[in-house]
């Protein structure tokens, strides 16, 4: 259970008994134990995100009790956001370093501790900073391995002169998509059905080695969105409707790929639960649903496997 105060979001376990079941499926499981919480226990305190609240008023369905004690449906007005997201973002923007012009600092100087990243970045023109944020516009970029899904990093000659390489990214969760033959991997839903993290890690370790041979720096995988609706066109890439299973399987994929010196890229962060017309969608989600369902798998993966890249979703999330 979770509760949100004005500025604190708490994850907590209510007092009581928690039965534990085991089995091959939900129809053939049996109780094997029980966990008892003697009193309410707060497991985590987090800063509440008031800007997750809706901007426009509407009524939501809630359970109520009539005079006879029977449950009936009722409606209540949703609490509205009182926070300016623009002000929050602007308040937390880091201070930009003063532009120095080219000082001859290469990216490898930063890697070898001969210069700081801030000093390297202070050399960059606005067009170079923009290029680093954007990447190349096209799939199958001429700057990368033929058949690539994207290239980013050193897409300008001036960046490459400073030692920033063009990074080749390829689809996807079921194998490398390039203009060459590559291994075909089982889909994410099937992998999650094994419940075998070690097997998944070993599979993607082999995949990482194949990436290195074929010139793929980043595999746009694992797909980690929640199976919210059976009609979602990307469900085959995703693991589960359960964020714990999705998070642990995603972490196994990341560890396997990155054990070979290349990068994984969990996607689509977050709430990409409809593929059709996805760039026009706006997912309206409560803070609790975000924290406990749609972000939880990503949280597990990031904290335990440390992916080098993450791909955002294509939709708007609560108006952004």
PLM features: what roles do these ranges have?
Residues 29-33:
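Extracellular and select intracellular beta-sandwich modules with Ser/Thr-enriched
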């Amino acid at each position: 259970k979770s509760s949100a105060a004005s500025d604190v979001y708490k994850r907590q376990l209510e007092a009581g008994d928690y039965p534990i079941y085991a089995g091959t499926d939900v129809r053939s499981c049996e109780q094997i134990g029980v966990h008892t919480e003697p009193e309410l226990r707060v497991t985590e305190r987090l800063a509440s995100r008031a800007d997750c609240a809706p901007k426009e008023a509407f009524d939501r369905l809630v359970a109520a009790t009539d005079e006879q004690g029977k449950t009936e449906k009722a409606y209540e007005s949703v609490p509205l956001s009182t926070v300016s997201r623009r002000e929050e973002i602007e308040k937390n923007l880091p201070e930009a370093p003063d532009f120095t012009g080219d000082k001859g600092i290469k990216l490898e100087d930063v890697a070898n501790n001969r210069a700081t990243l801030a000093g390297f970045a202070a050399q960059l023109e606005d067009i170079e900073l923009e290029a680093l944020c954007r990447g190349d516009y096209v799939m199958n970029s001429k700057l990368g391995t033929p058949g690539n899904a994207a290239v980013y990093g050193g897409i300008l000659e001036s960046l490459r002169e400073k030692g920033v390489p063009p990074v080749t990214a390829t689809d996807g969760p079921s194998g490398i998509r390039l203009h060459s033959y590559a291994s075909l991997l089982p889909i994410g839903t099937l992998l999650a059905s094994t419940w075998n993290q070690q097997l998944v890690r070993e599979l993607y370790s082999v995949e990482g080695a194949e990436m290195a041979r074929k010139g793929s720096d980043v595999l746009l995988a694992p797909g980690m969105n929640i199976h919210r609706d059976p009609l979602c066109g990307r469900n085959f890439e995703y693991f589960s409707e359960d964020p714990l299973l999705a998070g642990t399987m995603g972490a196994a994929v990341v560890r396997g790929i990155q054990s070979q010196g290349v990068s994984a890229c969990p996607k689509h962060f977050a709430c990409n639960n409809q593929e059709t017309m996805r760039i026009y969608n706006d997912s309206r989600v409560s803070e609790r649903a975000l924290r406990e369902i749609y972000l939880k798998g990503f949280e597990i993966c990031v904290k335990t496997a440390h992916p080098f890249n993450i791909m955002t979703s294509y939709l708007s999330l609560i108006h952004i």
